[in-house]
């Protein structure tokens, strides 16, 4: 079980949005590289990064900030937002990313995702962002008619490293993770699922460690970490203890 601290990039800065709204952005750090190093120093083992501008533009916008992050931390980094082509995937992986997250293109061109998994085994994740139970695309700005599980099942057996499932209706407002929907997805597919959107307190970490959530790879935390609602040491100690028990 992994707790992924999140760095969302808007105009080169670390921000958190409310409900995916770019107009409701709170700046937490103007130096993404320093924030990445701070998370590493706190004991986190992975980093989740999103290029928010890129998600809307359909191409990388905050590339300099991502490069600064990669230079500042030894931890593996996963990146989503605006990655839409095989060349783009290859370019980022060659620059040191551990894995890319494909969201909009997973809806628009699932064949590309399958091909990417063949070319870059273990380095391609799919981001499923849902609003009102339906998949959203283009930086959450457009709704589709696709169901969450319907989309996930398209990639069974393709070699997708993980599915990052975000409930947009809870993202950035500390409402708690949508456990019912998240666990339903985890039970429906064999691909590891990472929960995102709404993680609010240490209670969500404890919930993540319950036996019925064993199929989850982990969860992503943003605002709760930045606001001090979750103590990194306490959270990581809980996860470590749970791993030792399961071992």
From Swiss-Prot:
Q: Could you tell me which pathway this protein works in?
A: Amino-acid biosynthesis; L-histidine biosynthesis; L-histidine from 5-phospho-alpha-D-ribose 1-diphosphate: step 4/9
Task: Give the GO biological process terms.
Answer: L-histidine biosynthetic process; L-tryptophan biosynthetic process
The reaction(s) catalysed by this protein are:
1-(5-phospho-beta-D-ribosyl)-5-[(5-phospho-beta-D-ribosylamino)methylideneamino]imidazole-4-carboxamide = 5-[(5-phospho-1-deoxy-D-ribulos-1-ylimino)methylamino]-1-(5-phospho-beta-D-ribosyl)imidazole-4-carboxamide
Q: What is this protein called?
A: 1-(5-phosphoribosyl)-5-[(5-phosphoribosylamino)methylideneamino] imidazole-4-carboxamide isomerase
Write down the species: Agrobacterium fabrum (strain C58 / ATCC 33970) (Agrobacterium tumefaciens (strain C58))
The record's annotation in InterPro entries points to:
Aldolase_TIM, His_biosynth, HisA_bact_arch, Isoase_HisA-like, Isoase_HisA-like_bact, RibuloseP-bd_barrel
Q: Which gene encodes it?
A: hisA
A GO term, aspect molecular function: 1-(5-phosphoribosyl)-5-[(5-phosphoribosylamino)methylideneamino]imidazole-4-carboxamide isomerase activity
Q: What is one term from the GO cellular component aspect held by the record?
A: cytoplasm
For this chain, the family text in UniProt reads: Belongs to the HisA/HisF family.
Q: Where is the active site?
A: 8 (proton acceptor), 129 (proton donor)
Q: Which PANTHER family match?
A: 1-(5-PHOSPHORIBOSYL)-5-[(5-PHOSPHORIBOSYLAMINO)METHYLIDENEAMINO] IMIDAZOLE-4-CARBOXAMIDE ISOMERASE
Q: Name one Pfam family in it.
A: His_biosynth
Q: According to the lineage, what is the superkingdom?
A: Bacteria
Class in the EC hierarchy, top level: isomerase
Is Cytoplasm found in the keyword set? yes
Q: What is its EC number?
A: 5.3.1.16
- Alphabetical UniProt keywords: Amino-acid biosynthesis, Cytoplasm, Histidine biosynthesis, Isomerase
Q: Where in the cell is it found?
A: Cytoplasm
């Amino acid at each position: 079980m992994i707790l992924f601290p999140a760095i969302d990039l808007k105009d080169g800065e670390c921000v958190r949005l409310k409900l995916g709204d770019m107009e409701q952005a709170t700046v937490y750090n103007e130096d993404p590289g320093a924030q990445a190093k701070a998370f590493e120093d706190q004991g986190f083992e992975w980093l989740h990064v999103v290029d928010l501008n890129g998600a809307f533009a359909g191409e990388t916008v905050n590339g300099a900030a991502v490069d600064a992050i990669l230079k500042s931390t030894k931890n593996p980094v996963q990146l989503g937002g605006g990655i839409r082509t095989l060349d783009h995937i290859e370019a980022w992986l060659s620059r040191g990313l551990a894995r890319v997250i494909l969201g909009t293109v997973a809806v628009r061109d699932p064949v590309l995702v399958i091909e990417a998994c063949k070319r870059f085994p273990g380095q391609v994740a799919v981001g499923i962002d849902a609003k009102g139970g339906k998949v959203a695309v283009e930086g959450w700005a457009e709704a589709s008619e696709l169901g969450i599980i319907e989309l996930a099942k398209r990639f069974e057996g393709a070699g997708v490293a993980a599915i990052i499932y975000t409930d947009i209706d809870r993202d950035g407002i500390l409402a708690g993770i949508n456990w019912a929907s998240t666990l339903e997805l985890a039970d429906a597919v064999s691909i590891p699922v990472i929960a995102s959107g709404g993680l609010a307190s240490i209670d969500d970490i404890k919930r993540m460690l319950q036996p019925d959530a064993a199929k989850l790879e982990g969860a992503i935390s943003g605002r709760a970490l930045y606001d001090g609602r979750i103590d990194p040491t306490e959270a990581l100690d809980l996860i470590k203890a749970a791993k030792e028990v399961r071992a």
